[in-house]
């Protein structure tokens, strides 16, 4: 770790403490994040973990080197919701072809949407359908070890059998006993279950549904449960390439560094992942650090279709900033809206609940406009190394304190430290070089305008305002407007100080 970078500390849901991050292997830092189920447009709640863990991915690359970090985010392409959508949207197609159409188109849209939000591509994006062999092998191991059993062509995991063994306890992540979890959970009490808390690893496929050869000697075709998919995919991408997996008896090689997702996944999904992986691989921990982002509300209310406030990422990109109007290339406009959405979300610490508002999105767009305006005026070039981002890096090393990082960016803007501003924005995924260099971006249409002269007039006007000489301040504003330059006054969100920006009009 470079001497100038402080110790990275992350809050671990498993221990309920903020811990110093010590990778298992600093040359192979590994992170897994639960990704989308590709059956519909992703909503803004889905965007939050993508942005949060993209910032962490960038930070890990900054600290340990890009070539030493592996980030896996899965794609769930086997699910009842996918089946239902395929039957609804493509009733005339063979079912497997209909499913393929749903998953391919939805995944393509998801990738385009999250790219517009300024996110890097993960190192790998495994799909569930590509890892059936690993799922079957893991299920067979769990049956052999007595923590899973076959019943009516299903394979089920038994938390009580796990807790009867030496080793990690079921419920450690959620910090609840089996009785407490049963009392607070909605569970499927099927006749073939031995206990109510038992959960499905594999189930038979109904006629016409997609199916694969089953594990554990079951003769009918079937498909995996949700939880085993992530255990198998993380094993395939973060353990087996580094010497771990079902053939490895070394517990340390069968762990990776960080597992992330939304707070809603703590139970049952992540609890069940831990149970499966630890029992199959003989380790105390599936991942050393478990991180979870908080819930999202819209304008102070839970987001739901029934309330009419269900907002997709695509809605934000297309319609979230109507003041942008139509651009010659609307994909570029979408990228600008995506950066504004990213900044808006990062103004709340990832573990806190976030309240999504149209006002904050607009304010974030205005702030980005000011930052990019300075970078453009000073001719900032995309950096090869982030040698001036120490203040932002220090903030992010404190459990991804994005608010403190944004405060550092605001300070850099205030003192016109262009290197610190631009490189700090890059570390947070807020820097798109196109918006710094392109001459045809509508919001920066300032051809034949002397930016330094306007800045001097704005400074002169500010002096008049501070002296309460309103008439002279208004005179400068009106003169600039006659010259086709409109001033806009606002306040610095952090300090409350007056900020004046300008645009070419007419």
Swiss-Prot record:
Q: Which InterPro entries match?
A: Cys-tRNA-ligase (IPR015803), Cys-tRNA/MSH_ligase (IPR024909), Rossmann-like_a/b/a_fold (IPR014729), tRNA-synt_1_cat_dom (IPR032678), tRNAsynth_Ia_anticodon-bd (IPR009080)
Output the Pfam families linked to this UniProt entry: tRNA-synt_1e (PF01406)
EC top class named in words = ligase
What CDD domains does this protein map onto? CysRS_core
Q: What keywords does the record list, in alphabetical order?
A: Aminoacyl-tRNA synthetase, ATP-binding, Cytoplasm, Ligase, Metal-binding, Nucleotide-binding, Protein biosynthesis, Zinc
- Short sequence motif named 'HIGH' region, residue ranges: 36-46
Q: Where is this motif: 'KMSKS' region?
A: 302-306
What's the cofactor? Zn(2+)
Q: Which domain of life is it from?
A: Bacteria
EC assignment: the record states: 6.1.1.16
Record: residues binding Zn(2+): 34, 230, 269, 273
Q: Which residues bind ATP?
A: 305
For this chain's record, the cofactor binding note is: Binds 1 zinc ion per subunit.
HAMAP family linked: Cys_tRNA_synth
What is its quaternary makeup? Answer: Monomer.
Name the chain's protein: Cysteine--tRNA ligase
- Which organism is this protein's natural source? Brucella melitensis biotype 2 (strain ATCC 23457)
Organism ancestry = Bacteria, Pseudomonadati, Pseudomonadota, Alphaproteobacteria, Hyphomicrobiales
From the UniProt record, report the name of the gene that encodes this protein: cysS
């Amino acid at each position: 770790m470079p001497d100038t970078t402080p110790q990275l500390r992350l809050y671990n849901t498993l221990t309920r403490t903020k811990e110093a991050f010590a990778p298992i292997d600093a040359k192979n830092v590994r992170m897994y994040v639960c990704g989308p189920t590709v059956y519909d447009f992703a909503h803004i709640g889905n965007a939050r973990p993508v942005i949060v863990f993209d910032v962490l991915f960038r930070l890990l690359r900054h600290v340990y080197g890009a070539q030493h970090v592996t980030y896996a985010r899965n794609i769930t392409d086997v699910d009842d919701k996918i089946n239902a959508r395929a039957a609804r949207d493509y009733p005339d197609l063979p079912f497997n072809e209909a499913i393929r159409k749903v998953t391919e188109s939805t995944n393509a849209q998801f990738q385009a949407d999250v790219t517009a939000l300024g996110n890097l591509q993960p190192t790998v994006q495994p799909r569930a359908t590509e890892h059936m062999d690993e799922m079957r092998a893991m299920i067979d191991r769990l049956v052999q070890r007595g923590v899973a059993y076959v019943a009516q062509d299903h394979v089920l995991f038994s938390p009580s059998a796990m807790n009867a063994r030496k080793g990690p306890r079921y419920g450690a992540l959620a910090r609840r006993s089996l009785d407490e979890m049963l009392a607070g959970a909605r569970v499927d009490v099927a006749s073939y279950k031995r206990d109510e808390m038992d959960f499905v690893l594999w189930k038979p496929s109904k006629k016409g549904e997609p199916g694969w050869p089953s594990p554990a000697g079951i003769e009918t075709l079937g498909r995996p449960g949700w939880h085993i998919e992530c255990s198998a995919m993380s094993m395939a991408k973060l353990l087996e390439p580094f010497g771990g997996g079902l053939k490895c008896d070394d517990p340390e090689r069968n762990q990776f560094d960080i597992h992330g997702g939304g707070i809603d996944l703590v139970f049952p999904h992540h609890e069940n992942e831990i149970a499966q992986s630890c029992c199959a691989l003989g380790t105390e921990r599936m991942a050393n650090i478990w991180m979870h982002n908080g819930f999202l509300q819209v304008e102070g209310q839970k987001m739901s279709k029934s309330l009419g406030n269900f907002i997709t990422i695509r809605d934000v990109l297309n319609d979230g900033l109507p003041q942008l109007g139509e651009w010659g290339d609307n994909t570029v406009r979408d990228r600008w809206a995506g950066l504004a959405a990213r900044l808006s979300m990062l103004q709340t610490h990832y573990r806190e609940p976030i309240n999504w508002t149209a006002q904050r999105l607009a304010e974030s767009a205005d702030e980005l406009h000011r930052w990019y305006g300075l970078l453009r005026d000073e001719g900032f070039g995309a950096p090869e190394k982030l040698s001036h981002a120490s203040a932002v890096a220090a903030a992010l090393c404190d459990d991804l304190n994005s608010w403190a990082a944004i405060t550092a960016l605001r300070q850099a803007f205030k003192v016109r430290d262009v290197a610190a501003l631009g490189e700090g924005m890059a570390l947070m995924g807020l820097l798109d070089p196109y918006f710094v260099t392109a001459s045809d971006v509508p919001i920066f249409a300032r051809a034949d305008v002397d930016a330094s002269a306007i800045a001097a007039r704005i400074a002169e006007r500010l002096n008049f305002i501070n002296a309460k000489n309103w008439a002279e301040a208004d005179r400068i504003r009106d003169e600039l407007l006659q010259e086709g330059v409109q001033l806009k006054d606002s306040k610095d969100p952090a300090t409350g100080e007056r900020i004046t920006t300008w645009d070419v009009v007419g």
